[in-house]
Amino acid sequence: MKRNEEKILLLAIVGTLETVKNGGITIDEAEKFMFSPHMISELKVKKCNEKIIDLITKGCELEDIASLLPERLGEVIDELKKEAIMIIKTYEEYNKTFWIEE
């Protein structure tokens, strides 16, 4: 998987988490977009950064946290966003004009 594709994926993870936290989508919907065993399998095949795969694996636990420890859900989402941002910081700045044209 290309580094810029991984960075875009990380940006999508942060956005998905923020949208769940603010009620824009449900955890169930976030699982369909991002946090699923299927996504993990696909990313492993594409040789995605293991840190991103680990992050998505943790995201797969959001439904359990919501049902067992609902008072911690916001905190866990914030922790996952911080982790994603820390990974983003390890990537070089994108300096081409438009990623969509690659």
Indicate residue ranges for each PLM-predicted region.
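Acidic, Ser/Pro/Thr-rich low-complexity regulatory regions
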Residues: 1-102
